[in-house]
Amino acid sequence: LLLFILAIGGAARIWLSLVDDGIYWPDEVYQSLEPAHRLVFGPGLVSWEYGLGARTWALPGLIAALFWLCQAVGLDDPRQYLVTVRFAMCALAMATAWAGYLLARRLGSEPLFAASGAGVFALAGPAVYFGPKALSETASALPIVLGLALALSPQATRRDRILGAALLCVATIVRLHNAVFCLALLAVWVGQRRWRVLADALVVMGAGALALGTLDKLTWGDWFQSAVLYLRFTFVMRGGPVTGDSPATYYLEMFARSMPLVTAVAAALAIAGVLRARSLAAVVAIFLLAHFVTPNKAYRYVIVAIPLIGALAGIGLQVIHDRWSPRMSLAAAALLVATCVWSLATMRTLTFGDIGPYEKTRATDSAFDDVGPVNRLLIVASRQPDLCGLRVETHHLTWIGGYSYFHRSAPLYSAAGPDRSSGLYNFIITSTAETAGNPVADDGGFVLRRLGAGPCTPDPSYDPRLPGYDDIRQGLGR
C-alpha cells in the first residue's frame, strides 16, 4: 500500500511539475531560484533578503548545486534546469511522506495503518500542489519529520536522538522558523524529566546554531547575520504580512476549505492517536499554537503539519484496532485513504480562497498556473537570438519568474521602466490587444512582441534590485 500511495503521489507531483509554471508566492523565486541563478549563471533580480543578507544561503546553495550540475551536462535551458529543480522538490516531498510513515511505525503503528496515514501528505491536494515549489517550507519538511521519527520513538537509541535533533537543526538552518520544533522537542524532554537526553540535545542544538552562524559568516561576512536582520525586520521594523493580519482560526479554516474530508477524518483519527503518541501530539500542538497566535499567517507556513498529522492519524488507526475494533480500524483506514484520493482527484479546483495567499482579494481565482503564461513567454524571449532587452508590461517583476525564466544577460524591465522609444529593449511582453511590433509567441492572453532588431542602447543605470530594497535597507541601517 505504501509503495502504491507514494507512486500515485509522486506521479501527480511530476505531472504538475511539467504543466504548471505559475507562482504561488514570490519567495519560491526570489528566496531560492533567483539567488541560485545569479550565483551560477550571472544575471538575477535581487530581493532585499538576498541583497542585505537576511536569509541563509542554505536553500539557494542547494539549488545552485543542481544548476551547476545541469550546466555541466548541458541542461542550461530554463525549461531543463527548472524541471530538474521541481523534480528534486518532488523527490523531497515523497521522502517526507515516507518519513511520516516511519514516524508512525516507530511510535507503534502497523504498516497498513502507517501507510494510510502517510497518504495524507502523499495524496492530499494541497500537499501535492506545494510539492514542486522551491519553498523553504517544503524543502525543510523532510528533516523535520525524519528528525522527529528518530528522536521521539520510545525505542530510540542515544544515537537516534542525537541524529534526530541534528536533523531539526538542519531544518532550522534552511528555515529559521523551524526553531520552534527544536524548542518543542526540548519541552517534551523537559516534561518527561529526561535530563541526560536533554543535555545531549542542547549540545547538538548548540552545534547547529554554530553551524548557522558559521554559514552566515562565510557567506555574508557576519555571525548570525541572516537571523539578526530577519528578526530586526520582523520585530523592530514591524515588517508585516503583505496580505494583512489573519485571525487565530485562519489555519483551521484553510484546511477545512482546501481538503474538508481529509481534515475531518484525519483530525478525528489524530485525536485518537494522542492516546499513544503524546510526545508527537505535544510537538505538533506547540508548532500549531505558535502559528495560531502569530498575526502573519500563510498556508505554506504549516505545510509540514500535514505529514505530522497524517502520522498521528496512522497511530490513531492502531489505537482503534487495539482498543476497540479491528474491523472499525480497517474501515477507518479505507475511509482515510479514500478521502485523500478524492482530494487528489479534485485538486485542480483549488483556488486562492482555499489555500491562500490571496483569499481576501482573489478568492475565486484558480491557484494553478498563476502568471504561468508570462513565465513561459519569458522562456521564449530568452531563446531569441536578437534580444537585447525585455520589458514586461503586464506584471510587477516581483510577481513573475525573473531571470530564472528569462535566461539572458540583458536588462529586464517592468511596466514602470523606460518607455518604448528609449531604445533600451527590443522585446515586450504585453496583452494580446497590443499591436506594436511583430508577434513572436502568445500564451493565455499575453503576447511576446519584437519591437525591433536591435542592438539596444546600453543602460548604465540598470538596477536589478527589486522595488522596496532601499527603504528596507535604510530601515535596517545597512
List PLM regions with ranges.
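Start-transfer (signal-anchor) and selected internal transmembrane alpha helices
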Residues: 1-15, 105-108, 200-205
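Signature aromatic-anchored transmembrane alpha helix within multi-pass, membrane-resident enzymes
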Residues: 2-10, 205-206, 210, 277-281, ...
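Transmembrane-helix motifs of polytopic, lipid-linked glycan transferases
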Residues: 7, 83-108, 146
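Short helix- or helix-capping micro-motifs
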Residues: 9-12, 114-125, 149, 168-172
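Short acidic/glycine- and proline-prone juxtamembrane loop motifs at membrane-interface regions
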Residues: 25, 52, 126-139, 299, ...
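Hydrophobic/aromatic-rich transmembrane helices and adjacent perimembrane loops
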Residues: 37, 131, 137-139, 171, ...
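Membrane-lumen/periplasm interface segments of specific transmembrane helices
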Residues: 171-172, 178-245, 249, 253-256, ...
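Membrane-embedded, lumen/periplasm-facing catalytic core of multi-pass transferases
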Residues: 329-427, 432, 443-445, 461-478
